[in-house]
């Protein structure tokens, strides 16, 4: 069941979008996406992330506080505005609707695919947009690609006691 509210999603031409094929089930990938406190482990552009509510399952209306990796950056409050269990988690900035982070898991038989879209405004007119594209947005795009490789490693890692010494 799709649970959503607010305006229909408008995709910005400036949004960063990356995807990664996963050799794991969509359920395992979505479980990892829903573990907000673990986001800094695989999202390398974040220093911290935490939920503001009681810690129940992530759902529509849940609030998440994120701090980026830029030194001196303040914490930003986001709200889950779209949630489709097993498939979509979409965050929108609580104070700026132009700040958005979307996670989508696509099922492909025994494999899956994660698609992440990050969008934020660039202020300062044409010059500010140009400077942002040459500096911060380029770095963020590279970090997003690295982050999805980290996610792939975490979600595909299967270590049981019998697997530890399997090579010996």
What residues fall within each predicted segment?
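Hydrophobic ligand-binding cavity/cleft-lining segments
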Residues: 1-54
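Glycine-rich portal/gate segments that line the openings of hydrophobic small-molecule binding cavities
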Residues: 3, 41, 50-100, 108-109, ...
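Short phosphate-engaging motifs
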Residues: 25, 38, 72, 97, ...
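Beta-strand/loop substructures that line and gate deep hydrophobic ligand-binding cavities in soluble
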Residues: 92-146, 162-165
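Generic structural detector for well-ordered beta-strands
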Residues: 19-23, 79, 104
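A general secondary-structure boundary signal
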Residues: 15, 19-26, 73, 90-92, ...
């Amino acid at each position: 069941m799709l649970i959503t509210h607010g305006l229909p999603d408008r995709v910005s031409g400036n949004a960063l979008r990356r995807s990664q094929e996963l050799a794991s089930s969509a359920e395992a990938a979505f479980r990892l996406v829903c573990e907000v406190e673990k986001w800094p482990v695989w999202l390398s552009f974040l220093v911290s992330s935490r939920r503001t509510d009681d810690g129940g399952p992530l759902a529509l209306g849940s609030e998440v506080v994120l701090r980026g990796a830029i030194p001196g950056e303040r914490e930003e409050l986001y709200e889950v505005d779209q949630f489709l269990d097993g498939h979509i988690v979409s965050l929108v900035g609580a104070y700026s609707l132009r700040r958005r982070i979307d996670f989508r898991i696509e099922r492909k038989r025994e494999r899956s695919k994660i698609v992440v879209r990050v969008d934020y405004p660039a202020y300062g007119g044409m010059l500010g947009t140009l400077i942002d594209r040459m500096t911060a947005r380029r770095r963020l795009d590279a970090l997003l690609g690295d982050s999805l490789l980290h996610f792939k490693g975490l979600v595909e890692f299967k270590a049981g006691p019998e697997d530890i010494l399997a090579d010996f």
